[in-house]
Amino acid sequence: MIVVVLVCIFLANGIKATAVQPDLHEHPVLTWDLLQHFVGNTLYITTHQVLALPLGSRVECESVDGFNCTRPGFQNSAHDHIDFYFDLSNPFYSFVDNFYIVVEGNQKINLRLVGAVPKQKRLKLSYKATRCLKLVFPRNYWSSRCLLLYRMVSTCNGRYKQPHCILGSLDLIWQC
């Protein structure tokens, strides 16, 4: 009888130990104290990376030509921080490369992306009345009829729109 009780206790402890696993999402995080040193200054992102900021912080971009900007990158919340993913191959960053980190008290830290696809090397696509064009590579190019909000940014060759469609944040470019 004692052996059965001891086996049950060891099994229960073994199940409990395997059920409670340590948080594997561990990496350096910029703290509020560290971020205070950068208020009013600029941080530069030069490669694809994850920026780990404390809970409550936000990454935003300035409005361009009067339109609000929404950062298209993925973000992931952990127990003590938020990971902001920056993929510099995203064409959005060739339109908008100046962002800011909002820290506690609405203080701002400028954030600049360096190394995004240059404006001269983007695909320029004209459209007439087609709602969606399918190209050889896996991206859809939507007309302005599906936009929840759109962005206009001046370039050397005309005006371009960066759409954010109802179906989700799209990193698509076309020439108007």
Curated annotation (Swiss-Prot):
It comes from the Viruses. It comes from Feline enteric coronavirus (strain 79-1683). Pfam families: Corona_6B_7B. This is Non-structural protein 7b. Keywords: Signal. Residues 1-17 form the signal peptide. The lineage of its organism: Viruses, Riboviria, Orthornavirae, Pisuviricota, Pisoniviricetes.
